[in-house]
Amino acid sequence: MSLRVYNTLSGTKEEFTPLVPGRVSMYVCGVTVYDHCHIGHARANVVFDMIYRYLRHAGYDVTYVRNYTDVDDKIINRANQEGVPYNAISERFIAEFDRDMAALGLDLPTHQPKATEHIAEMIDVISRLIEKGFAYAADGDVYFCVEKFDPYLKLSKRNLDEMQAGARIEVGEKKRHPMDFALWKGSKPGEPFWESPWGQGRPGWHIECSAMSMKYLGETFDIHGGGKDLVFPHHENEIAQSEAANGKPFAHYWIHNGFVNINSEKMSKSLGNFFTIKEVLEKYDAEVLRFFLLSAHYRSPIDFSDQNLREAEAGLERIYGTLAGIDENLTKGAEGTAEETDRELAEKAVTFPERFREAMDDDFNTAQALGFVFDLVRSANRVLGEGKGGGSNRALLAEARDRIRKVGAVLGIFTSEPRAFAERLKNRKAAELPITAEEIERLIAERIAARANRDFKRADEIRDSLAAKGIMLLDSPQGTTWKVK
């Protein structure tokens, strides 16, 4: 099966055929850098990082562009509130965004352009739109005339007449039509500005992405992505101004990720259920958050809650536990018996790459792909649990481990050493306990001494006391370790 993607423009899954065989051009709208990034931003960026990784895994040479909107009303307002230059705000939050994305394991895009470094390109596109009659200047501002672009609203499938009926042009408004949108905004006192044929001012939001995508990917490219909230007006307006300026299709495939809900409610600052990436990563491991975000199909809404994050944490811990178990089995040599090859494990291991590819080729279905990972994990755990890790099964277990690792590299998960992940998780959980790690280790040492002195009553008291605090002791020939329940 060849790769099929859901195209918002057509409303159907389509076979993916890039403009240039073997090469993919992809533009994804980046953040407006005026505040801390929230988990909605995390989802969008993890989703398109996954797509970027999978396309490369599939053999494509991918040019991936993700911009920074570093001049905007929100940035200017915050700068004025803090009494600092607008670029002090944008640079601060660009640095924070980069830290968040690095923590989530994102690969760097090919290009990360800033809007303020591409003003000349924006002015050029606006000038072409005016020359072609699709835009008009009005007292220092420039607007796009939506009535001149017949296919307007083809992405969002809205009706212009109905939208006009619900709109009102305020007194003094410069627009000819309520839905006309700004390409250039005349300067106001206290705002940054650039020189232009229409006077000093700054670009509108929508023209920024059109100009930057054209510069790095050309007038027509393969994939344009972003969150569903960008379909209208941002992406709709991008299509209008780009296709009007160039007279050719803008992007062939429009891909949009679904929303993040908080405890089944829409995430909103007004509802008080707004979480930044930084806040979430103070409580959960970054790989757990990434695993959670990939556990649902990218177009489906995903419900963010402590319960769901804990379940994702447990699932990831289970996979790492299997990888650790396989590693331990392999280091023991050919111990264990296997009268015959475990057929279920053999079938799951052999067919796994093909099943993974089929899931991902079906509109990047990470939920199904991870389901196949858990199928393989269950089979491997059963073989290990039954003590059948020797003989031909030893090679099958190694194959299962390597294949889980390989798809993990594609998805950006399972990239840690199992012991390192377990230690990270243990330390994070231990920070919430009513006892320090040092005190736990001291009690373990005391318990070992008590057992050596055959003081089993004291040893049991220590074990029970730690259990009451949520700590499980694990005794083995190599010694005693602990984990948080």
Swiss-Prot record:
Disulfide bonds: none annotated. Binds 1 zinc ion per subunit. A motif ('KMSKS' region) lies at residues 266-270. ATP binds at residue 269. SMART domains: DALR_2. One of its GO terms (cellular component) is cytosol. The keyword Ligase applies. Its main location: cytoplasm. Its EC number is 6.1.1.16. It catalyses: tRNA(Cys) + L-cysteine + ATP = L-cysteinyl-tRNA(Cys) + AMP + diphosphate. One of its GO terms (biological process) is cysteinyl-tRNA aminoacylation. A motif ('HIGH' region) lies at residues 31-41. Keywords: Aminoacyl-tRNA synthetase, ATP-binding, Cytoplasm, Ligase, Metal-binding, Nucleotide-binding, Protein biosynthesis, Zinc. Its cofactor is Zn(2+). It is an enzyme of class 6 (ligase). Monomer. Belongs to the class-I aminoacyl-tRNA synthetase family. This is Cysteine--tRNA ligase. It comes from Geobacter metallireducens (strain ATCC 53774 / DSM 7210 / GS-15). The gene is cysS.
